[in-house]
Structure formats: C-alpha cells, structure tokens
C-alpha cells in the first residue's frame, strides 16, 4: 500500500493545518466526497460555538484530550524532565494553551483565542466566560455570583478548530462541503511502521 501510494504521487502535506481543508490534497488516500447542495456535512454547524452557528455544538474536545496533548518538546505536561513542566492539573488549567505542540492550535478553539470567522471583525476573539461571552457560548462557574453557565452539561468549554471552514458566515454553516478524509498517507505510514516493527524490522519502522 505504501509503495502504491508513493507511485501515485501521494505524499505528506507540508502544512499540518492544510490536511483537513485542502480538498484532494497530496495526503488524501480515501475521502468522503461532499459537494453542496447535493451532499453537505454537519461538521461545521455541530462544532462551532452557537453564537456563530445555527445550533449548539455537539462535538467538543474534552479536558482529558487537552491534557494529553504534548508540550513543545514532545513530552507530557506533568513529566518532570520536560522543559515546559507544569506541576499539576490545576496549574495546567491556568496555562493549558502555553508551550503546547503547535498542532494544538490547529485542533482546539478555547476561551480568549483569536477566531477569524467570517461575519466578525478581523481581530475577533471567541469567549465562553460568564458575563463576557454570548449566553449561548457560556461555560463555567462564577463562585462570587453563585452562578453556573447553563451549558455546563452540554459541552466542555472547548471547541473543535480542525477542519473548520471559517469563510462561511453564520447563515451558511449548513452548506459546509469540504471532503471528509477517511484515510490519509500518514496512517498508511504508521501501519507500515507498526507491521515492520512487529515482524522484526525495527530499522524500517524507525525510518518510516
């Protein structure tokens, strides 16, 4: 499969963030082809914050997912040998966006992050804090006011940024038709490397 893909000119996408939005990109092996209006995807309107969508988001990154993302040096946040070591989970809550693997910002939208979505100002930021954000987006607890956001049982306070089509205005989110990638070249390489390692060809696995 690897040799077949290489022979067909399939290769890794240079920019990670382009993998999900570049249709028929160099890394695509098996896609689900979408084309508005005949076939659209629910991805955009089920992952965006409600204030810029047509409904509340139903697919959200969890805190466990955010914690699991490596730091800039590839190590976990609680690894004492990491240059970016964070002592505990409570400390990470206050700095989870700092010194992370660059892919983190290509995957997660979080409170206070710049969000250049169509229909908003060029420097628009997405908030979910009580008293600051749109009520539809609010998440968390205000202990001083003894108030909880009404969305705490609906979503996690994080949103998916991956594969977002930020050129779509709020009224167009249901026309999202970017192809969905079922398999990309990186997965073929991982499978090849795993098979090589399991059959005693560790050097091939490392090179892959």
Regions found by a protein language model. Give the residues of each.
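An aromatic- and glycine-enriched ligand-binding surface/loop that stacks and positions planar moieties
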Residues: 1-140
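Extended, hydrophobic/aromatic-rich amphipathic alpha-helical segments that build helical scaffolds
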Residues: 1-7, 30, 96-98, 104-109, ...
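Acidic, serine/threonine- and proline-rich low-complexity regulatory regions
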Residues: 12-16, 169-177, 197
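Active-site beta-strand/loop architecture of penicillin-binding DD-peptidases
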Residues: 136-184
């Amino acid at each position: 499969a690897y040799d077949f893909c290489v022979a067909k000119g399939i290769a890794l996408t240079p920019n990670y963030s382009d993998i999900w939005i570049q249709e028929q990109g160099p890394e695509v092996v098996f896609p689900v082809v979408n084309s508005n209006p005949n076939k659209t995807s629910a991805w955009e309107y089920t992952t965006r914050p409600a204030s810029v969508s047509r409904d509340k988001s139903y697919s959200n990154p969890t805190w466990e997912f955010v914690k699991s993302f490596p730091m800039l040096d590839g190590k976990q946040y609680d690894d004492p040998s990491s240059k970016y070591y964070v002592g505990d989970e409570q400390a990470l809550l206050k700095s989870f966006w700092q010194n992370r693997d660059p892919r983190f910002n290509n995957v997660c939208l979080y409170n206070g992050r710049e969000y250049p979505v169509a229909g908003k100002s060029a420097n628009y930021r997405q908030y979910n804090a009580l008293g600051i954000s749109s009520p539809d987006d609010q998440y968390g607890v205000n202990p001083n006011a003894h108030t909880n956001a009404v969305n705490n049982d609906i979503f996690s306070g994080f949103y998916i940024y991956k594969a977002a089509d930020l050129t779509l205005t709020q009224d167009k989110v249901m026309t999202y038709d970017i192809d969905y990638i079922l398999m990309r070249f990186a997965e073929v390489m991982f499978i090849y490397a795993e098979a090589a390692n399991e059959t005693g060809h560790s050097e091939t696995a490392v090179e892959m």
